[in-house]
């Protein structure tokens, strides 16, 4: 079984001639300014700009468009008294705004320290689309654990009880950090039996990087184990959970 590593902005969209497409869109927007309020137009604009030059244009041009998306969404929800509504991925009409929100979150994740706005955007994404097709719950949980928000991390993992190994190991860490040692130990032993490579990688001082597909990893495989170690080992070590896990998982 394989799962996506993370959301890849623009992965589902592409154009053969981004220069020409951008010019066409700008002409259309000049003739019909109200289209600036269309999430479908905005996602096409962002994807086209990204194809022109993914690195240099991302912050000066793409970021302002993504900021506009957040403001526009709030206006739409407020105007329709729909602040508590869901915009689930299963409905194609919802996908442009969800893609745009996920893209904005992806930019946030590159910062070493999570801002309050970053947490708000990820939490909003999960409220809008609880099934979380974009996998926002994983980086949100990681940020919770890094920021010692263990109750939030535990609550999040419990919302997805049969989730991928990453979230299940995160539940163990949250339980341990909150002092629920017996529960943490029971979960850890279950995971050590079912997904042993992740725990093995976590406990080792150093491991070789396996071949990793940038789109998918094998659930419980060497690639997922390496990625989990990369993202979480420092937090496990800081909380004193590595030594505990080494003793309890035997």
Located regions from the model:
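Solenoid-like repeat scaffolds
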Residues: 27-34, 123-130, 156-165, 189-198, ...
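A structural/positional concept
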Residues: 26-57, 61
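Hydrophobic/aromatic side-chain positions at a characteristic register within alpha-helices
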Residues: 13, 17, 30-33, 50, ...
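Long, ordered, amphipathic alpha-helical scaffolds
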Residues: 1-4, 173-250
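"A position-specific structural signal for the A-helix of alpha-solenoid helical repeats
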Residues: 2-14, 24, 41-44, 48, ...
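Eukaryote-skewed repeat-based solenoidal scaffolds used as protein-protein interaction platforms
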Residues: 63-184
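Residue register within tetratricopeptide repeats
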Residues: 19, 23-26, 36, 60, ...
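Surface-exposed polar/charged interaction patches
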Residues: 31, 49-52, 72, 79, ...
């Amino acid at each position: 079984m394989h799962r996506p590593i993370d959301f890849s902005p623009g992965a589902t969209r592409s154009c053969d001639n981004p220069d020409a497409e951008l010019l066409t869109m700008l002409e259309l927007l000049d003739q019909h300014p109200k289209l600036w309020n269309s999430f479908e137009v905005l996602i096409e604009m962002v994807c086209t700009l990204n194809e022109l030059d993914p690195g240099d244009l991302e912050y000066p041009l793409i970021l302002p468009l993504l900021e506009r998306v957040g403001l526009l969404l709030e206006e739409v929800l407020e105007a329709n008294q729909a602040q508590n509504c869901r915009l689930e991925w299963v409905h194609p009409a919802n996908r442009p705004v969800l893609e745009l929100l996920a893209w904005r979150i992806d930019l946030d994740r590159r910062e070493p320290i999570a801002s309050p706005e970053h947490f708000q955007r990820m939490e909003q994404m999960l409220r809008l689309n609880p099934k979380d097709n974009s996998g926002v719950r994983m980086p949100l949980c990681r940020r919770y654990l890094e920021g010692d928000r263990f109750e939030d991390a535990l609550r999040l993992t419990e919302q997805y009880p049969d989730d991928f190994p990453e979230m299940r190991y995160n539940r163990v860490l949250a339980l341990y950090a909150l002092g629920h040692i017996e529960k943490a130990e029971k979960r850890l032993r279950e995971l050590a039996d079912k997904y042993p490579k992740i725990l093995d990688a976590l406990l080792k001082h150093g491991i070789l990087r396996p071949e990793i597909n940038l789109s998918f990893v094998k659930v419980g495989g060497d690639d997922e184990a390496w990625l989990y170690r990369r993202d979480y080992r420092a937090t496990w070590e800081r909380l004193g959970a590595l030594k505990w896990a080494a003793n309890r998982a035997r």
